[in-house]
UniProtKB/Swiss-Prot annotation:
<dbReference type="InterPro" id="IPR029021">
    <property type="entry name" value="Prot-tyrosine_phosphatase-like"/>
</dbReference>
<dbReference type="Pfam" id="PF14566">
    <property type="entry name" value="PTPlike_phytase"/>
</dbReference>
<keyword id="KW-0597">Phosphoprotein</keyword>
<feature type="region of interest" description="Disordered">
    <location>
        <begin position="1"/>
        <end position="34"/>
    </location>
</feature>
<feature type="modified residue" description="Phosphoserine">
    <location>
        <position position="89"/>
    </location>
</feature>
<comment type="similarity">
    <text>Belongs to the paladin family.</text>
</comment>
<dbReference type="InterPro" id="IPR050561">
    <property type="entry name" value="PTP"/>
</dbReference>
<keyword id="KW-0519">Myristate</keyword>
<dbReference type="GO" id="GO:0005829">
    <property type="term" value="C:cytosol"/>
</dbReference>
<feature type="lipid moiety-binding region" description="N-myristoyl glycine">
    <location>
        <position position="2"/>
    </location>
</feature>
<keyword id="KW-0963">Cytoplasm</keyword>
<dbReference type="InterPro" id="IPR003595">
    <property type="entry name" value="Tyr_Pase_cat"/>
</dbReference>
<keyword id="KW-0449">Lipoprotein</keyword>
<protein>
    <recommendedName>
        <fullName>Paladin</fullName>
    </recommendedName>
</protein>
Length: 859
């Protein structure tokens, strides 16, 4: 091997071999450890028994056997995990830690057993849903306890049963006399919390096997015992020693649940990890549905007249996640029995809870056929499972806490309120996903689950759009937005990349060459007059001007300066924005309370956006003002494209020479996107110019500069004449960008530029923000291509079918939303573990991630 080693005999004992192999004492060991890998002491012992010399080496230990005929290095990935010692306090003994940092703590206590079923049934909080449906829940049983649960189910005449363990944390079972009881690894800093999300891509089952092997190895180092804890609040008498003898001294979850089922083929076990907070992932719903699909007695088959199978859900305490599983199972049983009358009769005292006060629930009822009925069905299912935990009441309780939040100190305000708001959001999001699952059952249960839950959701993108409204946790009260918001003066000078403030009194004013399409930043009343005079002068002679205002924020002009409400709040319809601006104006015009001169208003003159334009309509008779709020950074919504095209077509039908002006805060992102939409629409209405040959681009990664991202080309391949459709969009982007080169690259370049910035930055929060931006820009580019395809394909029918309808009826079936649900840069990195690649998280961030802003005057 080329490795020089001494042949002098070196004694290596079991107690010291680990330090020798690891290259130092435990105190000097590297703090990093592999969750998936565990050091194999038995393998090391085997080598020790044969070894004449073991020489530490930077690559791996070099082992020379006694007969000097064999020399080898141990290239075992498992040896990279360090054995570490630790203790909970100075009064407790030191012992080995699993995975290098965790203590094993018994996770079931008598306090958890609220229903007192541990002794009588074998598991804590064992119960059945009200109404007699065969849906059960329980806490974590021991091995013998689980056998007693099975006996009870069989005694009750249940011939078929599906057992779901819904725990997502690793659990190991250690011998206690003739039984095996559960323990979970916990961090010293959070001894009351189970280990969650150990590492991306690491499954709890694999982690359990690694810990199982570790405990075997630790026991061999410490006289066949290992130290565990029963009470981390009172360390007197802790830790306890558990004898570990042989391979069967430690069991994992699958062994405890599957071994008793070996001789009962009609009883099946599945691991279905569910989160402790918030809703399950689509993949977790898919896993649940796949089990249902494999259960003929649960499917709507013609010859299926047998008894229903039992569904048994188990988590640690049998409350939170178990309750969620029971609600899911109850909804499935509803659809199998086609009636909920038995449950209505079972809970006559369950008072209806006002869930419709939440904007996202209102949106669901409005968008979904029989939406109100589906909400009522979910409420009945929750009530049937509410013996220990009521999910509806949890939503309302969290909302009440949020409304009555009073921090103990100013310094505590931000963190505490954020924690309360996060809990409120999680509970509402969970309730919303139960509604989605019930809607899924309505459509897919009669079809025996032809589509998985995740694929079905991609056929209903309007439901993903509702996620944006989830951030409005409480009822939408305009007065609350005003009371809790602040008024920010718009910064219109530093944004002036095109240096047009000096000439036009407004930032980034520009025109599309050879077309009456203009873009600008937020104008003041004075700047608006200058622009209208410019457009109607002797050179341009525009008789009709349509001004399309794109801001989603509440905007007022106060004493000659534009201001906006911060934070901007949830997305509102144009009419609601107008009403809220009027309400804010009235609020600002009222006397300031608690002042010596109560009649003094905050501003001398205050105008809404509508009033600013109305003042100029007298001087410019051809001016038409249109409010089409569009989200910043990301792609316009499908309905936004509808409104833009409708405004453009109506104006051009009236006067083909109409000029269009688009404006947002900076005159950049939203304005540029709307200008491209206008260019494409005008081309298709008046005739598209010939798109020239593709120019050669001599720069590194030229395909990105040309917009040839892998996901974009995937969309292009689905569209008729897709490459030409993309070329037209690229031509529109180029023509709009001709006069704005100093502002930045055009959209195709800014996608990859922002992606590289995200990879280069070292600050985690900034990296995530830039990653989101790059994906939003990429999605915006794809939507422009889809909109252009719509313009081409629907031209013969004069676009009678709106773009939103076309996306739902055509693009959805083509799989466009499934592509958008895996958005990213697979040619540069894996997108498997990136939540923002999925619609669920990316669209929800539209209202959760406003750009940072300095604090202004509180209202």
């Amino acid at each position: 091997m080329g490795t020089t080693a001494s042949t002098a005999q070196q004694t290596v004992s079991a107690g010291t071999s680990l330090e020798g192999l690891q290259g130092g004492s435990s105190s000097s060991m590297d703090s990093q450890h592999s969750l998936g890998g565990v050091q194999s002491f038995r393998a090391t012992s085997l080598h020790n028994s044969k070894a004449k010399s073991i020489i530490p080496n930077k690559v791996a230990p070099v082992v020379i056997t006694y007969n000097c005929k064999e020399e080898f290095q141990i290239h075992d990935e498992l040896l990279k995990a360090h054995y570490r010692m630790g203790r909970l306090s100075d009064a407790t003994p030191e012992h080995y830690l699993v995975q290098g940092r965790y203590f094993l703590v018994r996770d079931i206590t008598e306090k958890m057993d609220i229903l007192g079923t541990l002794k009588s049934c074998g598991a804590p909080n064992f119960r059945q849903v009200r109404g007699g449906l065969p849906v059960f829940g329980m806490g974590q049983p021991s091995l013998l306890g689980f056998r007693r649960v099975l006996q009870k189910l069989q005694t009750d005449g249940l011939k078929e049963c599906i057992i779901f363990c819904v725990r997502e944390e690793p659990v190991v079972f250690l011998r206690a006399e003739e039984d095996f009881v559960s323990y979970t690894p916990r961090d010293k800093e959070s001894l009351h919390e189970n280990l969650r999300d150990p590492s991306p891509g690491v499954k709890a089952e694999n982690l359990e096997l690694a810990i199982q092997k570790e405990i075997h190895d630790f026991a061999q180092l410490r006289d066949n015992v290992y130290h565990v804890y029963h009470n981390t609040e009172d360390l007197r008498g802790e830790p306890h020693t558990v004898a570990i003898r042989g391979e069967d001294g430690v069991c994992v979850t699958e062994e405890v649940f599957k071994r008793p089922l070996l001789l009962q083929p009609t009883y099946r076990y599945h691991h279905l990890p569910l989160p402790e907070q918030g809703p399950p992932l689509e993949a977790q719903f898919d896993a649940f549905v796949s089990v249902l699909r494999e259960t003929p007695s649960l499917l709507p088959l013609r010859d299926n007249h047998g008894p229903l199978p039992a569904l048994l859900f188990s988590c640690q305490s049998g409350v939170g996640r178990t309750n969620l599983g029971m609600v899911l199972g109850t909804l499935v049983m509803f659809h199998h029995s086609r009636t909920t009358s038995q449950l209505e009769a079972a809970s006559p005292l369950a008072k209806p809870l006002p869930m419709e006060q939440f904007q996202v629930i209102q949106g669901f009822i409005c968008k979904v056929p029989q939406g109100k009925k589906m909400v009522e069905e979910v409420d009945r299912a929750i009530s049937a499972c509410a013996e220990l935990h009521d999910l509806k009441e949890e939503v309302l309780k969290n909302q009440r806490r949020l409304e009555s939040f009073r921090p103990e100190s100013r310094g505590q305000e931000c963190g505490s309120q954020q924690a309360v708001q996060q809990r409120a959001l999680w509970s509402l999001e969970l309730y919303f996903y139960l509604l989605l699952f019930n809607y899924y059952l309505h459509e897919q249960y009669p079809l025996a689950f032809a589509l998985s839950f995740s694929r079905w959701l991609c056929t209903h993108p309007e439901l993903y759009r509702l996620l944006v409204e989830l951030n409005s946790v409480g009822p939408l009260v305009p007065g609350d937005l005003i009371a809790k918001g602040s008024l920010e003066a718009d910064d219109l000078v530093s944004l002036d990349a095109l240096s047009t403030v000096r000439e036009m009194d407004v930032a980034n004013f520009r025109r599309v060459p050879r077309m009456p399409i203009y873009g600008t930043a937020q104008p003041s009343a004075k700047a608006l007059g200058n622009i209208l005079a410019y457009l109607s002068d002797a050179k341009r002679k525009l008789r009709q001007v349509v001004w399309i205002f794109l801001r989603e924020e509440v905007v007022l002009e106060c004493d000659g300066h534009t201001h906006s409400l911060w934070p901007p709040g949830p997305a509102l319809a144009p009419e609601h924005l107008v009403a809220l601006e009027a309400q804010l104006k009235a609020h600002l015009s009222a006397p300031v309370p608690n002042t010596k001169s109560p009649t003094a208003p905050r501003f001398q003159k205050c105008l809404t956006t509508q009033e600013v334009f109305s003042q100029h309509q007298g001087a410019c008779l051809g001016l038409t003002y249109c409010r089409i709020p569009v989200p910043d950074f990301c792609a316009p919504r499908e309905e936004d494209f509808d409104r833009l095209l409708e405004a453009l077509r109506a104006a051009l039908t009236k006067d083909p020479g109409t000029g269009f002006v688009f404006s947002c805060l900076s005159g950049q992102g939203r304005t540029t996107t709307a200008m491209v939409v206008a260019v494409l629409a005008c081309w298709h209405i008046g005739g598209c110019p010939e798109v020239g040959e593709e120019e050669l681009v001599s720069v590194p990664d030229a395909k990105f500069t040309k917009g040839e991202f892998q996901v974009v080309m995937k969309v292009v391949q689905l569209l008729p004449d897709g490459h030409h459709v993309k070329k037209e969009v690229d031509a529109a982007l180029d023509i709009v960008s001709e006069t704005m080169t100093p502002m930045h690259y055009h959209l195709r370049e800014i996608i990859i530029s922002t992606y590289r910035q995200a990879k280069a930055t070292k600050e985690a929060q900034e990296a995530q923000r830039l990653q989101l931006r790059s994906l939003q820009y990429l999605e915006r580019y794809i939507y422009l291509i889809l909109f252009n395809a719509y313009l081409r394909l629907e031209k013969t029918s004069s676009w009678q079918r709106p773009f939103s309808t076309w996306m739902r009826e055509v693009a959805t079936k083509a799989g466009i939303y499934e592509i958008l649900n895996q958005l990213g840069f697979p040619e540069l990195e894996s997108i498997e573990e990136q939540p923002l690649s999925r619609l669920r998280y990316r669209w929800q961030e539209q209202s959760r991630d406003p750009e940072p802003c300095d604090v202004g005057d509180f209202l």
